[in-house]
From Swiss-Prot:
Organism: Catharanthus roseus
Cellular component GO terms held in the UniProt record: cytosol; endoplasmic reticulum membrane
Domain Flavodoxin-like as annotated: residue spans: 104-254
One of the Pfam families matching this protein, by short name: NAD_binding_1
Binding site for NADP(+): R332, T573, S634, R635, K640, Q641, Y642, V643, Q644, D676
Entry protein name: NADPH--cytochrome P450 reductase
Bridged cysteine pairs (disulfide): none
Length: 714
């Protein structure tokens, strides 16, 4: 390089470029600014840097031009606001209603989907009857983001129906809990619902003491706050045929809606309505394109790595420990299971419930495949819309599960062992090639066949597979089978039998095996209890069993003050939450807390067969986490003894503890034990407290209302 050549700074080069200097030494008479030979030489010497700078200038000029163009082209438009934050719940947005159109809203509170199905069925028939009406079906939890919005929106409602299930011992369903708390416990609003006409249908089970409590309370509260009831409250009983109860209530609805919604020129209300059979659109894709979906897919997804776990987003959890709790002398079985939640972010509280999704037994799945007459490797996907993306007719289809084989679908997603609903019988009838079988199915689903359906199917606990075997010509397509015949397999709930103070990375479950002969003669094997009994724990194999699980919070909690005395009553697997309670008390004691008296009434058949967790209970007793343990053995000695008998023997002690502020907890069977314990508690209050029957009843009810008498029953 010539020693006389100079290096230009970027600034000097840029100045030269902007003045129009040419690098090829062309005649200065061309458009441009003349530059001296020295400058030209310097530019040529720094040619690479010049190219970088010229490119940068071109890009800069281009950006400026685009900005000017966009600003000028948008000058006459409204400024776009930044998007709002995403709200976890999809709150229903208000929609504009054409003037002159009448509207009503159907709210549902559901745990297993039945109430939602009823709400959508009511809406579909109403749309067919009243073409000019605007009808909305709303998950009551999605109606509003907060209490203030609930009140604001309800004030605008003029016609509404509430289809509400009661869950457990008089509790609202998960999706109705927030609404129920606001509506029942809120401030006195006077007759703020005076413009609302309404009706309520409840879903419950008469075997529970607080039968249909949620529907009763909502119906009463709406009336108290000015609402006008246009149809009587009907309490559906799932212990019988709740479809018949809903059908009867629905028939009361139509005359009232005719008066409110029918126009003089509206003739649609007089036409006979026939409900369409729900059906998914089915696609049979190339399985090789979806192997990942088949391996990892689940109807509800998995939420590992996220912060929110619920029934729709469960947490995949390995089985860490499994052990049998009964002795070899027992002819029954009870399984203890540890779910490993370390590193998942899933947490729980003492007294909470765990929901577990389990697979159907292979023998059950194989029978279903045989009845459907389809190969198990059939790979398909379900869709609730048409190919062009528009929704299929009707709106009662539940969200479809991911693409999978028929075997996977029947294993994970189909409830095959419960008694089929009448709507399922009608769907089977529509695809029965034998006219006699079709007629028989239609009869069982009809009002005329009500008694025979109740006796032949419900009372005998006939399963869906048994019914399909009885009517072999019924071969529904997959879209109908999964939409209208086989309900979605539901999670099983268990009282958690551990405390996070003692087992922060494990959820313990105590599960009795369900293995019994039905009245119809079939051997019924519980889906989840059988799976748990056969689960392979991590301590035995790295290829261990796992299940999608989630935690459901409960109000079944120890008093905030550990010095408050507690009375616990729970025979059999009713011991589960109390094992967690005692672990909690032990941890508190080890931390130096002062504990109040704790008495536990436990019951089992025989000390040598089914006295579960005996060593642990004795340890809690010895170390002081438990003050007194009273065990009733129903199969030892000449007479059967149950927990209520032990309670009667300790009546004076129980009354003294209650008088000192004790909390009373009951866990176990709702149909027998819980009722007997409740009656015994009533008797103790009456006799020990010198009360008459009415006073004793009021006393026990007050214990419940103040949260000192809590039940976890099933």
């Amino acid at each position: 390089m010539d020693s006389s050549s100079e290096k230009l700074s970027p600034f000097e080069l840029m100045s030269a470029i902007l003045k129009g200097a040419k690098l090829d030494g062309s005649n200065s008479s061309d458009s441009g600014v003349a530059v001296s030979p020295a400058v030209m030489a310097m530019l040529l010497e720094n040619k690479e840097l010049v190219m970088i700078l010229t490119t940068s200038v071109a890009v800069l000029i281009g950006c400026v031009v685009v900005l000017i163009w966009r600003r000028s082209s948008g000058s006459g438009k409204k400024v776009v606001e930044p998007p709002k934050l995403i709200v976890p719940k999809s709150v229903v947005e208000p929609e504009e209603i054409d003037e002159g159109k009448k509207k009503f809203t159907i709210f549902f509170g559901t745990q297993t989907g039945t109430a939602e199905g009823f709400a959508k069925a009511l809406a579909e028939e109403a749309k067919a009857r009243y073409e000019k009406a605007v009808i909305k079906v709303i998950d009551i939890d999605d109606y509003a983001a907060d209490d203030e919005e609930y009140e604001e929106k309800f004030r605008k409602e003029t016609l509404a129906f509430f289809i509400l299930a009661t869950y457990g011992d008089g509790e609202p369903t998960d999706n109705a809990a927030r609404f129920y708390k606001w509506f029942v416990e809120g401030n006195d609003r006077g007759d703020w619902l005076k413009n609302l006409q309404y009706g309520v249908f409840g879903l419950g089970n008469r075997q529970y003491e607080h039968f249909n409590k949620i529907a009763k309370v909502v119906d009463e509260k709406v009336a108290e706050q000015g609402g006008k009831r246009i149809v009587p409250l009907v309490l559906g009983d799932d212990d019988q045929c709740i479809e018949d109860d809903f059908a009867a209530w629905r028939e009361n609805v139509w005359p009232e809606l005719d008066n409110l919604l029918r126009d003089e020129d509206d003739t649609t209300v007089s036409t006979t309505y026939t409900a369409a059979i729900p059906e998914y659109r089915v696609v049979f894709p190339d399985k090789s394109d979806s192997l990942i979906s088949e391996a990892n897919g689940h109807a509800n997804g998995y939420a590992n790595g996220n912060t929110v776990y619920d029934a729709q987003h469960p947490c995949r959890s390995n089985v860490a420990v499994r052990k049998e709790l009964h002795t070899p002398a027992s002819d029954r079985s009870c399984t203890h299971l540890d779910f490993d939640i370390a590193g998942t972010g899933l947490s729980y509280g003492t007294g909470d419930h765990v929901g577990v999704y389990c697979d159907n037994l292979s023998e059950t799945v194989e029978e279903a495949e045989r009845l459907l007459n389809l190969p198990p490797e059939t790979y398909f996907s379900l869709h609730a819309d048409k190919e062009d993306g528009t929704p299929l007719a009707g709106s009662s289809l539940p969200p479809p599960f991911p693409p999978c084989t028929l075997r996977t679908a029947l294993t994970r997603y189909a409830d095959l062992l419960n008694t089929p609903k009448k709507s399922a019988l009608l769907a089977l009838a529509a695809y029965a090639s034998d006219p006699n079988e079709a007629d028989r199915l239609k009869y069982l689903a009809s009002p005329a066949g009500k008694d025979e359906y109740a006796q032949s199917l419900v009372a005998n606990q006939r399963s869906l597979l048994e019914v399909m075997a009885e009517f072999p010509s019924a071969k529904p397509p997959l879209g109908v089978f999964f939409a209208a015949i086989a309900p979605r397999l539901q999670p099983r709930f268990y009282s958690i039998s551990s405390s996070p103070r003692m087992a922060p990375s494990r959820i313990h479950v105590t599960c009795a095996l369900v293995y019994e002969k039905t009245p119809g003669g079939r051997i019924h094997k519980g889906v989840c209890s059988t799976w748990m009994k056969n689960a392979i724990p991590l301590e035995e194999s790295r290829d261990c069993s796992w299940a999608p699980i989630f935690v459901r919070q409960s109000n079944f909690k120890l008093p905030a003050d550990p010095k408050v005395p507690v009375i616990m009553i729970g025979p059999g697997t009713g011991l589960a939450p109390f094992r967690g309670f005692l672990q909690e008390r032990l941890a508190l004691k080890e931390e130096g807390a002062e504990l109040g008296t704790a008495v536990f009434f436990f019951g089992c058949r025989n000390r040598k067969m089914d006295y579960i967790y005996e060593d642990e209970l004795n340890h809690f007793l010895e170390i002081g986490a438990l003050s007194e343990l009273l065990v009733a053995f129903s199969r030892e000695g000449p007479t059967k003894q149950y927990v209520q008998h032990k309670m009667a023997e300790k009546a004076s002690d129980i009354w003294r503890m209650i008088s000192d502020g004790a909390y009373v907890y009951v866990c176990g069977d709702a149909k027998g034990m819980a009722r007997d314990v409740h009656r015994t508690l009533h008797t103790i209050a009456q006799e020990q407290g010198s009360m008459d029957s009415t006073q004793a009843e009021g006393f026990v009810k007050n214990l419940q209302m103040t949260g000192r008498y809590l039940r976890d029953v099933w």
